[in-house]
């Protein structure tokens, strides 16, 4: 599944007016939630530094060229994912400024924003190269399994087994200290709950159908720092997928 959810799994709420918009943005500020700023010529990851009834201040991106392009853009789309909803808003421009002595962008507080609440979280597919692995201590104490990460969200993961899974494994089981090894994006150790056990089918090199177990889990214990880091990974993987798609157009 890509970086979207099915329409039936979403409820869209338009927040209008200063107080409603300010309330949502203050929560993003308090949680230091990463935000993706996109425009026709590029994108970058940032965070809110300050927000009040008239303006919002966001941090500079890490690349000077990206910052220059953002300053020249006439319309910028902002996306931030929380555990409860995806926040989307549009800014007409960014102005260079300073915040606490460091360069920043200032924009007028938007008159509205969209909150997309869902039963399912937005998921992004994990890359096939390099492969990311999940190391799963089986709840029945029979050892540790290595599974391939298939997709990732703030809410949980989908993973594919390279072999069989323990017969005693069942939905609702808690997996302690699940380890995600994601190469350059780092390692995450979290507790998770098994939501479903399914099957994943692909066509093999000899045109045969290969069926492997697929496990879906939801995270139980992400702290604020892990959530921010995981969101950065998701944004990076989304960008990687878009860049790859453009090359094959």
Curated annotation (Swiss-Prot):
Q: Name one GO cellular component term.
A: bacterial-type flagellum basal body
Task: Show the disulfide pairing.
Answer: none
Classification via InterPro entries: Split_barrel_FMN-bd, T3SS_YcgR, T3SS_YcgR_PilZN
Q: Where is the PilZ domain?
A: 117-236
Tell me the GO BP annotations in alphabetical order: bacterial-type flagellum-dependent cell motility; regulation of bacterial-type flagellum-dependent cell motility by regulation of motor speed
- The answer to keyword Nucleus applying to this record is no
Indicate where this protein resides in the cell. Bacterial flagellum basal body
Q: Does the keyword Nucleotide-binding apply?
A: yes
Q: Write down the Pfam families for this protein, in alphabetical order.
A: PilZN
Q: Where is the signal peptide?
A: none
Record keywords: Bacterial flagellum, c-di-GMP, Nucleotide-binding
Top-level taxon of the source organism: Bacteria
- Any one Gene Ontology molecular-function term assigned to this protein's record: cyclic-di-GMP binding
Q: Which family does it belong to?
A: Belongs to the YcgR family.
Q: Could you describe the subunit structure of this protein?
A: Monomer. Interacts with the flagellar basal bodies.
What function does the entry list?
A: Acts as a flagellar brake, regulating swimming and swarming in a bis-(3'-5') cyclic diguanylic acid (c-di-GMP)-dependent manner. Binds 1 c-di-GMP dimer per subunit. Increasing levels of c-di-GMP lead to decreased motility.
Q: What is this protein called?
A: Flagellar brake protein YcgR
